[in-house]
Amino acid sequence: MKHLLIALRVTLVFTLITGAAYPLIVTGLAKGLFRHQADGSLIQAGGHTVGSEWIGQNFTKPGYFHGRPSAAGNDGYDGLSSGGSNLGPTNQKLADRTAADIRKFRAENPTFTGSVPPDAVTASGSGLDPHISPETAEAQVARVAGARGMSQEAVRQLVAANTAGRQFGFLGEARVNVLQLNLALDQAAPGRR
């Protein structure tokens, strides 16, 4: 009986430490030091929350930049079903889907004649990547500019202003947050989408 009481006390103490004290301390530190990130890196526009810096959204209108394809959930961009397709490089389903995505990308961007950037036709590991490469953004400039009645140079300037370089100067690649870029487009050309 003595060992059982000791085990129960240890369980209770560690439950309080790891289940209450530690989460409260870490949450308090996060809210105090990194409030924006601790609250989900939410993006506001027009007094409303329109998304998060870290969760991709499905933009389909011609006047918006389109993000990467999503394998999260049945219809994509399902935050509750985050994950990749897990299809290997020799899987015929992946080859067929990629070929279909290339045809779709070319149909949406008929003036683009270069090689389709890989991130324009492949889903990320999470299926919810909010970024595209500057090359993928450049491939969409003509379509977006035409749909918005803007010059391509004005759209390119918005892309450049919303392009982040490598993290710490050497990690990863340059990237464009699609939601932030599309919000900048809405500010530059309101009513034209």
From Swiss-Prot:
The keyword NAD does not apply. Keywords: ATP-binding, Cell inner membrane, Cell membrane, Ion transport, Membrane, Nucleotide-binding, Potassium, Potassium transport, Transmembrane, Transmembrane helix, Transport. One of its GO terms (molecular function) is P-type potassium transmembrane transporter activity. The keyword ATP-binding applies. It is a single-pass membrane protein. The chain crosses the membrane at residues 10-30. GO terms for cellular component: plasma membrane. It is found in: Cell inner membrane. InterPro entries: KdpC. It comes from the Bacteria. Its main location: membrane. The system is composed of three essential subunits: KdpA, KdpB and KdpC. Part of the high-affinity ATP-driven potassium transport (or Kdp) system, which catalyzes the hydrolysis of ATP coupled with the electrogenic transport of potassium into the cytoplasm. This subunit acts as a catalytic chaperone that increases the ATP-binding affinity of the ATP-hydrolyzing subunit KdpB by the formation of a transient KdpB/KdpC/ATP ternary complex. NCBIfam families: kdpC (TIGR00681), PRK00315.1 (NF001454). Belongs to the KdpC family. This is Potassium-transporting ATPase KdpC subunit. The lineage of its organism: Bacteria, Pseudomonadati, Acidobacteriota, Terriglobia, Bryobacterales.
